[in-house]
Amino acid sequence: MKTSDFLVIGAGVAGLSFALRAAEHGKVAVITKGKFLDCSSAKAQGGIAAVWDRNDSFEDHIADTLDAGAGLCNEQAVRTIVEEGPGAIRELLEWGVNFDPGNQGEDYELAREGGHTKRRILHAKDATG
């Protein structure tokens, strides 16, 4: 019988992020109902949005998200996710994610995509989502 300190159910980005953190404190097992890459995170397309540019703000990102959500978003949840976004990007960088480098002295290429009024989408080639 296999044993672990932490059992993570799901191999998407949320589950694997937790597994990486939990691994600092004990043995981790990750299980999924299908193939390892047969999860929504692996099938997602596009990039990851975060306030990364000094010309952007949390308030602008929150407003864009609430507007695009057509009244269906929980404002406090949106605020929390947006405000924690830059920290999540820094953590991904520490884990070795190579976001596309920027031009003209920028650290990373930032794109403007649907629903966003500012450039805040980071890509890692075509693998992010």
Please describe what each predicted stretch is:
Residues M1-S4:
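Core beta-strand elements of the Rossmann-like FAD/NAD(P) dinucleotide-binding domain
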Residues F6-V30:
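N-terminal Rossmann-like FAD-binding beta1-loop-alpha1 element of flavoenzymes
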Residues T32, F36-G129:
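Conserved N-terminal/central alpha/beta ligand/cofactor-binding core
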